Amino acid sequence: MLIVVSPAKTLDYESPLVTSRFTQPELLDHSAELIGRARQLSPDQIASLMKISDKLAGLNAARFADWQPDFSPANARQALLAFKGDVYTGLAVEDFSEADLDFAQAHLRMLSGLYGVLRPLDLMMPYRLEMGIRLDNGRGKDLYQFWGDIITAHLNKALAAQGDEVLINLASDEYFKSVRPKALQGRIITPVFKDEKNGQFKIISFYAKKARGMMARHIIKHRLTKVEQLTGFNADGYYFVAEESDANTLMFKRAEN
């Protein structure tokens, strides 16, 4: 079973590390090519392209300028420990043991606009380059064309390494669009999380993101390897709804308090 999640815009390079172990990202040649393109952008162009403030644009222009592929713990941090968004609040890696990290390293992948695919212990320098931005490059008009089949091929390699064919999609639509389902040598299962609001169940982005992280944590902490085991997920009041699930979708709901 392979789990994919989205990265986060918010980064943390300050908190204490839960491990000193690290690995190197496997697609850095592609990252370096993208950095070369990103360095051609002025801070004003970055602000416009990413729809961010001038201050953030300046920070990210500096990050592009400072980036170099020789990662070490002195200039980079393990991806699972560097991302700090809603998904990662749900993952709550602060209490992960080395055994948890071993399982995560084998079964969890983070999709990334700059790095393509990251394993939990892969070092990464700070960046902001969302998969959905329309950055034209030497391979096409956006990052989906840049990555092409590369991300899917990399996930196929990970699935083959564990002798499995189940991919659990806990990523956002923006990021999962970088995966080509027809080329994926596996079955895609997508958990969906709905919260009750004013008597109706709907996907509420903030809660859904956190729930995706909690599901990833549940799989890692309990060493789950079969799809049917996921139906037991009940963190924070979510419950499995069999009649609204099918072969490709697992529906979870949470009632209003």
From Swiss-Prot:
Signal peptide boundaries: none
Spans through the membrane: none
Record-linked InterPro entries: YaaA
GO biological process, one term: response to hydroperoxide
GO cellular component terms, semicolon-separated: cytosol
HAMAP family: UPF0246
Family to which the UniProt record says this protein belongs: Belongs to the UPF0246 family.
Protein name: UPF0246 protein AHA_3667
